């Protein structure tokens, strides 16, 4: 791995960890510290966290911060194949690190909450706290319905990311693109968050899930109490959705724009 790629992976690690730290910190404040936050406020914090992370990293790595985005850009926007796996590893590691850091700062409040509510980690009831770190679907949704939600919202996310970063599509977005992407995430979260927690990012979900598995929630963290282990859904569905969104943008919008594009 050359020095340039190391720097890019380092940026992906830091950026992914940063927005996870903000998002998990927000949910920790809500659930174990008694903060008063509504759905829109939570979504805005997640969205602005992503915007700030992209601003931090875009000049070095492009600010992917999401394996689904990296894979879609490789398949549909000429991102170099040799960078895909290192980026993804850095993103998963960053997500784990962001979850760990947020937990360290709030650990005493987690312990106090569990003691006060007689909550045992690894029980179904403990998913209430595990959901601070990663996503689980609403009880009324089965695994396949949750997967469909994640495919749809990630396809919207990816299609809009390509539109917002494509200077050939209307007015150049330039420095506004990260902010607009953050607003996009907040809007998606506000409209569909109660269904699945709007993961849209395998690293954002599995990195913290791995942390909770190690931190005492065990298999319950991975399965979500479902017969089909739920951790699979936020890994696979966002990749499918991102590729679908990129393909739709590429073939219905991008190919009709007056600019040069790489050939598949």
Curated annotation (Swiss-Prot):
GO terms for biological process: glycerol transmembrane transport. A motif (NPA 1) lies at residues 66-68. It is a multi-pass membrane protein. InterPro entries: Aquaporin-like, MIP, MIP/Aquaporin, MIP_CS. Induction: By propanediol aerobically and anaerobically, under control of PocR, Arc and Crp. Has 2 promoters. One of its GO terms (molecular function) is glycerol channel activity. Disruption phenotype: No visible phenotype, not required for BMC formation. Reduced levels of PocR protein; pocR is transcribed in part from the pduF promoters. The chain crosses the membrane at residues 10-30, 42-62, 84-104, 143-163, 179-199, 228-248. One of its GO terms (cellular component) is plasma membrane. Keywords: Cell inner membrane, Cell membrane, Membrane, Repeat, Transmembrane, Transmembrane helix, Transport. A motif (NPA 2) lies at residues 201-203. It is found in: Cell inner membrane. Probably facilitates diffusion of 1,2-propanediol (1,2-PD) into the cell. Modeling suggests active transport of 1,2-PD is required at low extracellular concentrations to allow maximal growth and saturation of PduP/PduQ within the bacterial microcompartment (BMC); this protein may be the cellular transporter. Aquaporins contain two tandem repeats each containing three membrane-spanning domains and a pore-forming loop with the signature motif Asn-Pro-Ala (NPA). Belongs to the MIP/aquaporin (TC 1.A.8) family. NCBIfam families: MIP (TIGR00861). This is Propanediol uptake facilitator PduF. It comes from Salmonella typhimurium (strain LT2 / SGSC1412 / ATCC 700720). The gene is pduF.
